[in-house]
């Protein structure tokens, strides 16, 4: 089992089908759910499901994670790109090693898997997931 950082394969087709709207203010609600290192997440992940083994748990963490703030997609140099504002899990006690971004408005469809590169442990502290800056080479989500 592993957490493999990737854009989910199903998401690539769903974008072309118009199933995801990332527009600031009027788009779908996307959430960030945290997972422990033993979770099995990767390109074949198609949806968020509360029954999927490996979701983090702990004080002040709710299954399903937290809502993200969309940043409207842009395009430059042949690449479409978009991201989210940084996400803060407040005053949590938990351990995690990765996350799943998913569309909670539209069937909990998976968008991408994040691997934090290490196991993170927080005890009654904020956990901040910092997204890279918006740009054709840096954004967390890019299609070239």
Enumerate the predicted regions with their spans.
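Small cysteine-rich, disulfide-bonded extracellular modules of the LU/uPAR three-finger superfamily
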Residues: 1-97, 104-144
């Amino acid at each position: 089992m592993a957490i493999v950082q990737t854009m989910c394969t199903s998401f690539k087709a769903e974008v072309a089908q118009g199933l995801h709207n990332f527009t600031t203010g009027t788009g779908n609600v996307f959430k960030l759910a945290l997972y422990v290192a033993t979770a099995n997440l990767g390109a074949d992940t198609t949806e968020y499901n509360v029954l999927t083994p490996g979701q983090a748990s702990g004080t002040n963490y709710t299954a399903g994670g937290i809502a993200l703030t969309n940043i409207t997609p842009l395009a430059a140099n042949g690449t479409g790109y978009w991201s989210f504002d940084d996400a803060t899990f407040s005053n949590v006690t938990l351990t995690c090693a990765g996350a799943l971004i998913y569309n909670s408005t539209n069937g909990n469809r998976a968008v991408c898997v994040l691997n934090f590169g290490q196991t993170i442990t927080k005890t009654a502290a904020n956990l901040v997931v910092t997204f890279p800056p918006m740009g054709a080479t840096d954004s967390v989500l890019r299609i070239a």
